[in-house]
């Protein structure tokens, strides 16, 4: 399973660890992902999504029905 938020599309990005001597070694910055069950009142069922913390805030703001409609529009499985 890839580390991608289903709502926002956030993915890992690359950067550098920097030591005190400013040596650079490659690293990955991973999104803050959680598998979370959301209750969909219109369908009377739970839906499990792999979302970032930002994705949860988007769902709080727009509502789960709107977000699921956007996922369906781009043929995302959930």
From Swiss-Prot:
It comes from the Bacteria. The keyword tRNA processing does not apply. GO terms for molecular function: structural constituent of ribosome. SUPFAM superfamilies: L28p-like. InterPro entries: Ribosomal_bL28, Ribosomal_bL28/bL31-like_sf, Ribosomal_bL28_bact-type, Ribosomal_bL28_sf. PANTHER family: 39S RIBOSOMAL PROTEIN L28, MITOCHONDRIAL, LARGE RIBOSOMAL SUBUNIT PROTEIN BL28M. This is Large ribosomal subunit protein bL28. It comes from Shigella boydii serotype 4 (strain Sb227).
């Amino acid at each position: 399973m890839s580390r991608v938020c289903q709502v926002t599309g956030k993915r890992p990005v690359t950067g550098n660890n920097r030591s005190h001597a400013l040596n650079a070694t490659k690293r990955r910055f991973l999104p803050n992902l959680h598998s979370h069950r959301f209750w969909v009142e219109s369908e009377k069922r739970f839906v499990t999504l792999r979302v970032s913390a930002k994705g949860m805030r988007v769902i709080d703001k727009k509502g789960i029905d709107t977000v699921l409609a956007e996922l369906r529009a781009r043929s995302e499985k959930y």
